[in-house]
Amino acid sequence: MASPGSGFWSFGSEDGSGDSENPGTARAWCQVAQKFTGGIGNKLCALLYGDAEKPAESGGSQPPRAAARKAACACDQKPCSCSKVDVNYAFLHATDLLPACDGERPTLAFLQDVMNILLQYVVKSFDRSTKVIDFHYPNELLQEYNWELADQPQNLEEILMHCQTTLKYAIKTGHPRYFNQLSTGLDMVGLAADWLTSTANTNMFTYEIAPVFVLLEYVTLKKMREIIGWPGGSGDGIFSPGGAISNMYAMMIARFKMFPEVKEKGMAALPRLIAFTSEHSHFSLKKGAAALGIGTDSVILIKCDERGKMIPSDLERRILEAKQKGFVPFLVSATAGTTVYGAFDPLLAVADICKKYKIWMHVDAAWGGGLLMSRKHKWKLSGVERANSVTWNPHKMMGVPLQCSALLVREEGLMQNCNQMHASYLFQQDKHYDLSYDTGDKALQCGRHVDVFKLWLMWRAKGTTGFEAHVDKCLELAEYLYNIIKNREGYEMVFDGKPQHTNVCFWYIPPSLRTLEDNEERMSRLSKVAPVIKARMMEYGTTMVSYQPLGDKVNFFRMVISNPAATHQDIDFLIEEIERLGQDL
């Protein structure tokens, strides 16, 4: 095994012993390279010498002289202790990298420089003195940079500049003061896993092309089903491109379970189907209904209480109404952690109703599923074990890098029967291994990204207790924020009571509005406060928090905490920053 000090740039011989007898030189290599045709020799010499004289090119101007960078050594020892020679990327293009002949050294040099750019960005992401975003309006970015695609290739110096520019204007989602979305933070193990996944660059449809990843998906989904509460982790599941697709999978499977003929005959052979979900549920239920031909009018929205929880009596009433009209209720989607309020529907009561009327029960726990990792908070999902299917997004509350969403199904084989098409060029039945590990035919997609490795590697690094600590910390920070602002001058809570999740919903009331009566004029003026403060946050780059209206409530801030880097001091900063930016409104 090579010692830790052998370094990134070392090239091991086949037996790992190295060869110290033939040191070689850049000059010797350059002389050999001149025998190659097509300009390869000149490019290799430029690579070896860096600041050497540029080769002449007929019929065109010379590229601008670029800063030389250190690259792989010029000797042939494996490993060696030579100092790295200079690389001038103005002479190099993507065609000089692997799999090009002699592309190893420029490839290592290029990827090392890309890695340096990425690592600098990672470090800056956690620096509170840096901006969350260097905001520019779309027309400014379009005018300042040429983003158009060209017919001719650019050199690698320009490619590296594009990498830097892209990250310069990207949102630092790992910044401790980024609270804008449900998915925040930047986990180092998850990041490493994502790099590995991209390097492996394989598909998830069969065991033969993704043996380890397929097994990890099997192990991880089984563990998630155990945590849900299904005996022995039995059932099925798949990682999908996001919670919206996971929810649509659930609708497809529920429909197939009730009417398996839909797979061949389509919706024309079915009665009108009706799905039920709360008025605070995610819009993906209606999108799924539209995509599946069920229609958005066939998604009935159930009333919620003042905390955003589905009212079971209204659910039962609407089911009976649909049945009286001759419609067929086929799915109830309860939400465990709504997007805005963070509400948890009463799953036990919903399960009783679904059992009574023989309706598929789905739980959209995309946001709230992470609480199942916490012994302190998992009670909020009591009844999830009675669901027929569950959506769970580890890329939200568990901090796994995007994307990582799972659909879990209680009945094994149902997903396969619903979606399989028996493509013989992929799913041959006479393979030499257990075909149950060829999982691709149960997916809607053919090409499917490897999403499991990030979650699996983070789970190995943290353990279940590590995820639990993260969840508990985030909910404690949410309660800390709530306790500060609930009685603070200039703040009004959108609903009474401490947060159910990490969602803290509130209005900031500027001094000019604090003495006004609670009437239409005040509401109209208040609706403009959050958008202006949010715009100022982005222009200063200090923090980011989302806002939205909901029902008859005008724009309010929705603070969500899933960022592992956030601390009590960041919550204090947020409050002070909102007051600073909104004081004059």
Curated annotation (Swiss-Prot):
UniProt PTM: Phosphorylated; which does not affect kinetic parameters or subcellular location.
An example of a Gene Ontology BP annotation on this entry? gamma-aminobutyric acid biosynthetic process
Q: Which residues carry this modification: Phosphoserine?
A: 3, 6, 10, 13
Q: State the residue spans of region: Disordered.
A: 1-24
Q: Where in the cell is it found?
A: Cytoplasm, Cytosol; Cytoplasmic vesicle; Presynaptic cell membrane; Golgi apparatus membrane
Tell me, what's a Pfam family for it? Pyridoxal_deC
Could you tell me the keywords of this UniProt record? Cell membrane, Cell projection, Cytoplasm, Cytoplasmic vesicle, Decarboxylase, Golgi apparatus, Lipoprotein, Lyase, Membrane, Neurotransmitter biosynthesis, Palmitate, Phosphoprotein, Pyridoxal phosphate, Synapse
This protein's superkingdom? Eukaryota
Q: What does this protein do?
A: Catalyzes the production of GABA.
Q: What is this protein called?
A: Glutamate decarboxylase 2
